[in-house]
Amino acid sequence: MRALITTANLIVGKSGATTVAGSSIGLSNDEDRKRFKQLREESDLIIIGGNTARREPYKRTPIPLYILTHTKVRLQPKNQLAKQFLLPPAQLFKEISENFPPIESSSAVKVLVEAGPMLLQSLIDQGLIDHLYLTTNLIKDGENRISVDHLVANFELVSQEIIEETKFEQYKKI
């Protein structure tokens, strides 16, 4: 059984919007994409939910992609590294801990959660997220607003940086 280090990444608009026209892409910019890529490079595995699988471009990922869903409908994008799981989140995390290759490794599995706000909040409420990277676009806004205060309530702020119209915050679980 391997330890998991779980990191989540989310971008929001100036008033907590999580999408523009149904996707987070409209809130992103070059600096956000650069940091997003860096998080992926430091991870072993990406977890997304079914809504994210349907709305965001996940046809290719540099590392395995696990889709956590509550439906039997096949959601996997045409991605050779994608697997779909119909499990409660805690059970999926246990499955990863016990069976993520190489099984004989003693190093922690670095999991990057790129889920939407509903699944992310559920994972946070279950205590399954260790680190949260929150990007706020200080200019743009959209729909599907969330309470950022509620999202970060179980975390402490580790660092904050503002570059042009974007605020980057890093949190760790309390």
Features from the language model and the residues they span:
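Enzymes that bind and transform nitrogen-containing heteroaromatic metabolites
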Residues: M1-I174
